[in-house]
Design a protein with these regions (language model features):
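Hydrophobic faces of well-ordered beta-strands that scaffold small-molecule active sites
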Residues: 2-7, 31-35, 62-66, 100-101, ...
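Hydrophobic alpha-helical scaffolding
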Residues: 11, 78, 102, 125, ...
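Shared catalytic-loop signature of beta/alpha-barrel
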Residues: 96, 107-124, 129-230
Length: 254
């Protein structure tokens, strides 16, 4: 049975807190982590990345999520423009990050192409991609290095397989975003184990607000990351899991 290399997500927070959290994850065997920007000034987030890189050295991959791909109704600040994305990418170049994720709105294909041409930092995008043509545009017109489509959103395992195959033909990788629930994680793990160009599988984990128990509440067990930083899909037929019907019963409305 295969397994996927996992990356874990953390909000940038303070430099000191991120430093200690990153060291703890590294000591657990994690090979990679992703830092999500959230400060009003992205330069403060870059300082957090600097602290994490200093803490873990080159022993872990660091991904950075600028979180500019789409907006929530309550988001008051505008998305980054190309100039901001370029400036941020330039600041991150010395920190040897694995990728810069969604530094521009998903539909800004010309912006992505210009950014890719101006930086050595690999650019990732596409976590909310629903259709194959959207992924194709990001890969061919936008020139991104990593497509992040999720099995739950892009037509299931079959749809994701087609997109990952397109990425492979273009010399790009697929790394599922997987920010959903235990079922989504299991489905993406199975797909990742079957596809040769997958990179890391993102594992939602940001306690106490987002714990493994909260993520996997519908499953009969909690998915655990092994000491070598990998996570294996359940071994049974199909997805290898049955829903926890008792857990679902509490949400019955009729």
């Amino acid at each position: 049975m295969g397994s996927g290399s996992s990356s874990q997500w953390m909000r940038s927070g303070s430099s000191a807190a991120a430093h200690s959290r990153a060291v703890a994850l590294r000591d657990r065997g994690l090979r990679a982590l992703k830092i999500r920007f959230h400060h009003p000034d992205w330069r403060d987030d870059v300082r957090v990345v600097e602290a994490v890189r200093a803490a873990v050295g080159d022993g872990m991959e660091i991904m950075v999520d600028a979180n500019q791909g789409w907006r929530m109704p309550g988001d008051l600040a505008p998305a980054w423009d190309l100039a901001t994305a370029r400036e941020c990418a330039a600041a991150l170049e010395p920190l040897r990050i694995h990728w810069l994720e969604e530094p521009l709105p998903t539909a800004d294909l010309d912006g992505y192409a210009a950014l890719v041409a101006s930086t050595s930092v690999p650019i990732a995008a596409g976590e909310m991609v629903r259709q194959e043509h959207e992924a194709r545009d990001l890969l061919t017109r936008g020139g991104i290095a990593v497509i992040q489509c999720d099995v739950l959103f892009c037509g299931g395992i079959g749809g994701c397989r087609r997109i990952a195959g397109l990425a492979r033909e273009l010399g790009c990788s697929w790394s599922p975003h997987t920010w959903s629930n235990g079922y989504g994680l299991v489905a993406n793990l199975h797909a990742a184990c079957a596809l040769s160009n997958h990179g890391y599988v993102e594992v939602p984990y940001d306690p106490p607000a987002w714990s493994a128990e909260r993520r996997d509440w519908m499953l009969p067990f909690v998915l655990e990351i092994a000491g070598d930083g990998t996570i294996a899909p359940p071994p049974g037929p199909g997805l290898g899991i049955e829903p926890d019907l008792d857990a679902l019963e509490r949400w019955r409305v009729a």
